[in-house]
């Protein structure tokens, strides 16, 4: 109760179906608050639904969706805000989360796509690192050698994209010498449909995210 009475920023980290009952429990306090910011980490729970419970335009509402690399300060955090939230409040949240990774403010309607790309993305990358590791072991590297090489390759390659600002296709082309090993591997990956499979995986994650939102709304 004291938290809802005195805090300027409250992070709410419960299940989506638990948030509205929680807000209803403290509605008497929330009715009297101004300059309060509630930050929800519940997937799929729309800001409008929380606003309908609180019924106080002076309470700012923010949705965030972090991914697991926030645990080592290298995460992606998607953020959407209600109209009552000021730029100063967003800056405050950014400051509080600065040690967790990069924060990207987006429209609320894009939260589910962002979840599919960034929230689910680490699992897809782990699969690719694992596959490259297994390939290296099959070619004679020790598992430790192959794993370290594959993981470092992903890290360095990602940093190249971020620091150069170049399109990934241009950076890929720079690695592919005519008639060389790399272009042979790239062509084979195109033949087996790697690009399409990754796109399909992200789309499947997005579809399931929307299904979970609908399931939570029924609870």
Where in this protein do the model-derived segments appear?
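Aromatic-residue-lined binding/catalytic grooves and analogous aromatic/hydrophobic interfacial grooves
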Residues: 121
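NAD(P)-dependent Rossmann-like dehydrogenase/reductase catalytic/cofactor-binding core
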Residues: 151-219
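Hydrophobic alpha-helical segments typical of transmembrane helices
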Residues: 18, 46-49, 92, 124, ...
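Short pre-catalytic strand/loop immediately N-terminal to key active-site residues, enriched for Gly-Thr
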Residues: 62, 111-116, 168-173
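Internal alpha-helical scaffold of NAD(P)-dependent oxidoreductase catalytic cores
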Residues: 49-60, 76-113, 125-163, 208
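Rossmann-like NAD(P)(H) cofactor-binding subdomain of soluble oxidoreductases
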Residues: 1-79, 83
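Glycine-rich beta-alpha junction loops
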Residues: 43-45, 66-70, 118, 152-154, ...
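Small-residue helix-packing motif on alpha-helices
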Residues: 3, 19, 50, 142-149, ...
